[in-house]
């Protein structure tokens, strides 16, 4: 079995972006939950989200069957190069878990993983 690691865990609360910060097509303020901060302690994973984490649009993010967002660290070098960035911290894509060794083409709906004491299912 291939080894998978969680390299970083991030949480964050929704933030209102004003006209100066927004890049959406309307130019109007909007709320997003994409901004995450790395934590260095165990975190409780519940049915709807991680403790200290929340989503802005619950119709498409968070809640039952959408509690944890995972993104592979293997994609970060591509995006740093594509966006001409020297730094891009884990969590930049709004993910809760930044992993190593867990790529999309190796994961199927229904797969079950153990993360510490938590069991998560895709």
Regions found by a protein language model. Give the residues of each.
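Electropositive, beta-rich accessory/interaction domains or terminal extensions
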Residues: 1-115, 119-122
